[in-house]
Amino acid sequence: MTHILFAVLVLALLALAFGIILGFAAVKFYVEADPIVDQLDALLPQTQCGQCGYPGCKPYAEALANGDQINKCVPGGDATMRKIADLMGVDPQPLGSAEAAIPVKKVAFIHEDQCIGCTKCIQACPVDAIVGATKAMHTVITDECTGCDLCVDPCPTDCIEMIPVPTTVDNWKWDLASVAIPVKIVE
């Protein structure tokens, strides 16, 4: 019994000593983060889709702080690019290349008759837009899907297809900045 108490006491003292050492090291070797990277990261949509060419939003924010192009975030769209331009003090640019200036929004569609319920697409989806259970068919919540295309490659049966979202009154992007609105000033 005394051997057990002695072992517990020694482990507790070691844990306390290592905790003090780690606390001291955290204070002594603290590295100040770049505040602009944190601000840029807060503006990005956090989908971690990789369409910008970086493995996630934080690495893209670091690249933006180092002077990379501000128009690579497709899920963030034009609004995010304009916020980044305002923060960085640069002119807004069209998204992607010249052909991608007007992107076609796409969402994932699962052909449920071909789905085997492997859950690989659910694991790949960064925004949890796919619902389903193991060995049961899955489906996509289209309002949540960002169209990042990350769920297509892991699917072993190729039952996921990216389809364009039809333009309706509900999802139409009105360009009110270019529309002249007549105003009459009454005195």
From Swiss-Prot:
Keywords, alphabetical: 4Fe-4S, Cell inner membrane, Cell membrane, Electron transport, Iron, Iron-sulfur, Membrane, Metal-binding, Repeat, Translocase, Transport
Domain 4Fe-4S ferredoxin-type intervals: 106-135, 136-165
Residues that hold [4Fe-4S] cluster 1 according to the record: 49, 52, 57, 73
EC number: 7.-.-.-
Predominant cellular place of this UniProt entry's protein: membrane
Superkingdom of the organism of origin: Bacteria
GO CC, any one term: plasma membrane
Keyword Cell inner membrane assigned: yes
Domain 4Fe-4S: residue ranges: 32-90
InterPro entries xref list: 4Fe-4S_dom, 4Fe4S_Fe-S-bd, 4Fe4S_Fe_S_CS, Elect_transpt_cplx_RnfB/RsxB, RnfB/RsxB_Proteobac, RnfB_subfamily
Binding site for [4Fe-4S] cluster 3: 125, 145, 148, 151
Class of the enzyme per the UniProt entry, highest EC level: translocase
Sequence segments annotated as region (Hydrophobic): 1-26
Residues where [4Fe-4S] cluster 2 binds: 115, 118, 121, 155
Listed GO biological process terms: electron transport chain
Co-factor: note: Binds 3 [4Fe-4S] clusters.
Any matching Pfam family: FeS
Coiled-coil region list: none
Subcellular locations according to the entry: Cell inner membrane
HAMAP family per record: RsxB_RnfB
PANTHER family: ION-TRANSLOCATING OXIDOREDUCTASE COMPLEX SUBUNIT B (PTHR42859:SF3), OXIDOREDUCTASE (PTHR42859)
Entry's family note: Belongs to the 4Fe4S bacterial-type ferredoxin family. RnfB subfamily.
Quaternary data: The complex is composed of six subunits: RnfA, RnfB, RnfC, RnfD, RnfE and RnfG.
Function: Part of a membrane-bound complex that couples electron transfer with translocation of ions across the membrane.
NCBIfam families referenced in this protein's UniProt entry, alphabetically: PRK05113.1, rnfB
Protein name: Ion-translocating oxidoreductase complex subunit B
Classification lineage: Bacteria, Pseudomonadati, Pseudomonadota, Gammaproteobacteria, Aeromonadales
